[in-house]
Amino acid sequence: IMSKIAVIGFGSLLWDLDDLAPKVSGEWKMYEGPVLPLEFSLVSRKRHYALALVIDYGDVAPCPTCVIDSVRSEIGAAIVDLANRERMAPTNIGFVDRNTGESHSHREETRKIFWNWIDDRDYDGAVWTDGERNFEALTGKAFNLQTAQDHLRSLQGIPLEEARRYIRNAPARVDTTLR
């Protein structure tokens, strides 16, 4: 049987599929993904140290995510596709697979959210970027509105442009402390 796999997006994936483009079909279904706690608390090396959205269980607001269909029918291939786009190891891609009952995430809470979401959907699996906040580790400061703004103010040139574009382009309903 053919499996239908959802790719869940909440950050730059929505406006920059990059090398994932040939591996998905159709348009983004806006705000039809699971509701996740999101914050701009990931310092992204890929994006020149701009702040990027990450699933974050700190004091953050739940935000709706978006869905696009993978062309893959095998969860492992969908994981590798997303890992390649994110320039990260497959272990940093979360997944739930209804066919095998297997799943992976750094956080049990996230797996529960995805199992609940997929339960009454027409998908057999889902993959998502399962990064973890690293703001404290990379800046040495606790994440809050002030320290995040200070970090953004410290950026210049290309990193600053990247940061502005990312925060501006994030979906309108991603309503976080920083935004």
Roles of regions detected by a PLM:
Residues 2-179:
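A glycine-rich, hydrophobic/aromatic-adjacent loop/helix-cap motif
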